[in-house]
C-alpha cells in the first residue's frame, strides 16, 4: 500500500496537524487511544496509508512531531489525542527559534535535524511502499518556516524519488504575529520552489474572512481557523485514504496539477460552508457545490481567482453524488467561464469521487486549483519584504546566526522570478506556446 509519512513542524504546524489527525481518526473510526471503533469496512480498507497497525491491533499515526520548544508538544500529549501518537515520534528542543528563520534553518534547527531524520527513517522503513511525505507548517514563524524547509531539503536528499507535499500557512498583515514574517516567508518560499512537489497555500487572512463572512463568527479563534484547515486537508487526502474510482496518490495529483515544475503552489477551497444556524434552510445540490467551490470567497488563500487564470483544477466530491451530474456541472462551468481557464491545456479540470462523506454532511467537495492569481499572495509578501529589506531592518538577527545578505537578495529574486513566470503563463495564448518553449532553452 502507498503510505504517507506526515511531519508537523513548529507551533502552527503541530496545532493544524493535530487537528487533522483528530478529523482523520474520527473518519476512520479510531479513538484517542488508537483502538478501532468504526462500523464500515471502507474505513479500514486503506487505513495503512496514514496509520501503522501494531501487534496488539492499535493504530498509530505515521506522524513525526517537531518543535524547537516543548510547549506545544506538552499540550498535545496532555490533550485528547495524547495517547494516539508514538511517544518516540515527538522530537523537540528547549530553546525555541524566536520567530527567526535563521535559527530554525541554520543553528538551533540544524542541531535537532538529525534526530528528526532518524525518526523519519524509522517511519519510512516501517512502510511497504512509501509514496511520500506531507509537512504542515507556517511560513511566518521560525521553526515551521526555517526548520520545516530544512527538513524538506534533507528528506529530498535522502528520498529523491518520493513526493513531497506541504500545507503551508502564509502570513498575512491582518493576522500578523511578528514583524519579521515577510523575511521568514520569502526565505521559505525560496526553498519550497526548489524542493516541494506540491504546496497547498493556506492564508490566515482568507480563513478569517471565511469565518466572518460565511460562517458568521464574530470573533474567530485559532481553533476555528485550524478547524477549516483540517477540513480541507481531510478533503485533499480523501482520495488517498478511501477507495474511490479515481484512486489518486500524491504523484497522480502532481501529474494532473503541475504543468511546469516551479508552478506548484495551489489554492484550496471547500464547500458547503454555511453558518451554524442556517444550514437547515439550504438544499445542497451538485450545482450549488460547484458554484460555491469556484467562488472567490471560498478560497483559503487571499488571492482572487478572477484576477488570474486556472492552469489546472482538481475537485474531490464526497458522499452520494451522481458522477454524471458532476461532469455536466464541470463542463458547464468551464464553458460559461472559459476566459478563466488557459486554453492551451485541454481537459484541465479533473474530478474525483469518494463515497464516504465527512461527518455531519451528506455531500461535500474539496477544491484544488493551480491559478496564476496566487502571485498576488507572493506579491503581497514580497512588497512587505522589500520595504523592510531596503532599510536592512531587523537583519542583524539573521546575520547574527551566520546568514549573509546575499541569501536575502537571492530569495527575493527567486520569488520575483516565480511571479514573472505566473504572469507569463497567465497571458500566454495557444499561439505563443512555441515561442515560450523556445525562450526557455538555456543560452550557452
Swiss-Prot record:
Keyword annotations of the record: Cytoplasm, Cytoskeleton, GTP-binding, Microtubule, Nucleotide-binding
Database matches in PROSITE patterns: TUBULIN (PS00227), TUBULIN_B_AUTOREG (PS00228)
GO biological process: microtubule-based process
GO molecular function: GTP binding; GTPase activity; structural constituent of cytoskeleton
Superkingdom field: Eukaryota
Keyword hit for Ion transport: no
Binding site for GTP: 11, 138, 142-144, 204, 226
Gene3D superfamilies the record matches: Helix hairpin bin, Tubulin/FtsZ, C-terminal domain, Tubulin/FtsZ, GTPase domain
Primary location class: cytoplasm
Effect of residue 69 to E: In strain: 22000, A128 and Nine
Record flagged with keyword Nucleotide-binding: yes
InterPro entries noted in UniProt: Beta-tubulin_BS, Beta_tubulin, Tub_FtsZ_C, Tubulin, Tubulin/FtsZ-like_C, Tubulin/FtsZ_2-layer-sand-dom, Tubulin/FtsZ_GTPase_sf, Tubulin_C
Subcellular location(s) per record: Cytoplasm, Cytoskeleton
SUPFAM superfamilies named among the record's database cross-references: Tubulin C-terminal domain-like, Tubulin nucleotide-binding domain-like
Function: Tubulin is the major constituent of microtubules, a cylinder consisting of laterally associated linear protofilaments composed of alpha- and beta-tubulin heterodimers. Microtubules grow by the addition of GTP-tubulin dimers to the microtubule end, where a stabilizing cap forms. Below the cap, tubulin dimers are in GDP-bound state, owing to GTPase activity of alpha-tubulin.
Family, similarity comment: Belongs to the tubulin family.
Subunit details: Dimer of alpha and beta chains. A typical microtubule is a hollow water-filled tube with an outer diameter of 25 nm and an inner diameter of 15 nM. Alpha-beta heterodimers associate head-to-tail to form protofilaments running lengthwise along the microtubule wall with the beta-tubulin subunit facing the microtubule plus end conferring a structural polarity. Microtubules usually have 13 protofilaments but different protofilament numbers can be found in some organisms and specialized cells.
Name of the featured protein: Tubulin beta chain
Amino acid at each position: 500500500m502507498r503510505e504517507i509519512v506526515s511531519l508537523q513542524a513548529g507551533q502552527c504546524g503541530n496545532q493544524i496537524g493535530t487537528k487533522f489527525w483528530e478529523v482523520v481518526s474520527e473518519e476512520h473510526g479510531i479513538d484517542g487511544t488508537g483502538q478501532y471503533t468504526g462500523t464500515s469496512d471502507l474505513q479500514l480498507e486503506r487505513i495503512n496509508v496514514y496509520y501503522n497497525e501494531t501487534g496488539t491491533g492499535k493504530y498509530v499515526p505515521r506522524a513525526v512531531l517537531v518543535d524547537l520548544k516543548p510547549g506545544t508538544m506538552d499540550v498535545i500529549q496532555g490533550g485528547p489525542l495524547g495517547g494516539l501518537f508514538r511517544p518516540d515520534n515527538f522530537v523537540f528542543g528547549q530553546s525555541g527559534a524566536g520567530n527567526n528563520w535563521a535559527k530554525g534553518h541554520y543553528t538551533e534547527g540544524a542541531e535537532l535535524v538529525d534526530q528528526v531524520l532518524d525518526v523519519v527513517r524509522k517511519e519510512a522503513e516501517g512502510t511497504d511502499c512509501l509514496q511520500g511525505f506531507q509537512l504542515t507548517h507556517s511560513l511566518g514563524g521560525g521553526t515551521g518556516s526555517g526548520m520545516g524547509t530544512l527538513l524538506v531539503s534533507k528528506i529530498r536528499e535522502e528520498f529523491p524519488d518520493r513526493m513531497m507535499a506541504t500545507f503551508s500557512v502564509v502570513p498575512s498583515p491582518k493576522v500578523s504575529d511578528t514583524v519579521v514574517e515577510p523575511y521568514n516567508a520569502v526565505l521559505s518560499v525560496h526553498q519550497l520552489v526548489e524542493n516541494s512537489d506540491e504546496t497547498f497555500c493556506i492564508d490566515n487572512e482568507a480563513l478569517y474572512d471565511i469565518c466572518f463572512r460565511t460562517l458568521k463568527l464574530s470573533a474567530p479563534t485559532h481553533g476555528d481557523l485550524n478547524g477549516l484547515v483540517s477540513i480541507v486537508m481531510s478533503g485533499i487526502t480523501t482520495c488517498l485514504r478511501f477507495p474511490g474510482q479515481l484512486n489518486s496518490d500524491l504523484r497522480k495529483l502532481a501529474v494532473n496539477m503541475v504543468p511546469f515544475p516551479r508552478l506548484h503552489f495551489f489554492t484550496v477551497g471547500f464547500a458547503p460552508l454555511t453558518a451554524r444556524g442556517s444550514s437547515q434552510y439550504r438544499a445542497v445540490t451538485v450545482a450549488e457545490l460547484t458554484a460555491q467551490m469556484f467562488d472567490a470567497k471560498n478560497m483559503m488563500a487571499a488571492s482572487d481567482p478572477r484576477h488570474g487564470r486556472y492552469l489546472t483544477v482538481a475537485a474531490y466530491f464526497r458522499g452520494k453524488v451522481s458522477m454524471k451530474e458532476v461532469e455536466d456541472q464541470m463542463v458547464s462551468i468551464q464553458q460559461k467561464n472559459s476566459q478563466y481557464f488557459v486554453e492551451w491545456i485541454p481537459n484541465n479540470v479533473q474530478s474525483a469521487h469518494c463515497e464516504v462523506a465527512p461527518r455531519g454532511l451528506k455531500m461535500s467537495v474539496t477544491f484544488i486549483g493551480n491559478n496564476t492569481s496566487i502571485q498576488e499572495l507572493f506579491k503581497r509578501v514580497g512588497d512587505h519584504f522589500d520595504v523592510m529589506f531596503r532599510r536592512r531592518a531587523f537583519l542583524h538577527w539573521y546575520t547574527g546566526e551566520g546568514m549573509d545578505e546575499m541569501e536575502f537578495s537571492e530569495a527575493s529574486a527567486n520569488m520575483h522570478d516565480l511571479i514573472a513566470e505566473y504572469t507569463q503563463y497567465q497571458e500566454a495564448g495557444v499561439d505563443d506556446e512555441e515561442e515560450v518553449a523556445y525562450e526557455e532553452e538555456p543560452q550557452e
